[in-house]
Amino acid sequence: MKTFSAKPAEVTKKWVIIDATGLVVGRLATLVAMRLRGKHLPTYTPHVDCGDNVIIINASKVVLTGRKRDNKVYYHHTGFIGGIKERSAKAILEGRFPERVVEKAIERMIPRGPLGRVQMGNLRVYPGAEHPHEAQQPEKLDIGAMNRKNMRAA
């Protein structure tokens, strides 16, 4: 039997919606990264974007285990000398764009490169319950029911 290799024209993409309320960030990110890459499919091909389109709602209500909410630090650089800045996960989750914690966790699990950037484009993260993708009729995916460790009381 010959090895199957998916062609970009043969790939059919599904739309999946995930409610992130009470979900542990790392566990959510691993499952979403796998879906974005298409590794949950038997027809997975490493060099083709064969993953699903993923919508995450209520991203501001995710949970970090242990003391990570206070102690985890996110760094960025302004580009100027001595311009390294840091913010805690708590500051980001309580700030203007709380969905960035989830986006960064997923982004760091996707390979860097042209294909990784395309796959990250298939991710939509919203801090609240509203999203503009009703026309795509997304299929609901309950990550909390997959494993009891995926859910944590806030």
Curated annotation (Swiss-Prot):
GO biological process: negative regulation of translation; translation
Residue spans crossing the bilayer: none
Molecular function per GO: mRNA binding; structural constituent of ribosome
InterPro entries found in the cross-reference section: Ribosomal_uL13, Ribosomal_uL13_bac-type, Ribosomal_uL13_sf
Record-linked Pfam families: Ribosomal_L13
Keyword set includes Ribonucleoprotein: yes
GO cellular component terms, A-Z: cytosolic large ribosomal subunit
Origin superkingdom: Bacteria
Keywords, alphabetical: Ribonucleoprotein, Ribosomal protein
Purpose: This protein is one of the early assembly proteins of the 50S ribosomal subunit, although it is not seen to bind rRNA by itself. It is important during the early stages of 50S assembly.
NCBIfam families per the UniProt record, alphabetical: rplM_bact
Family indicated by similarity: Belongs to the universal ribosomal protein uL13 family.
Subunit structure comment from the entry: Part of the 50S ribosomal subunit.
Protein's UniProt name: Large ribosomal subunit protein uL13
Organism: Rhodopseudomonas palustris (strain TIE-1)
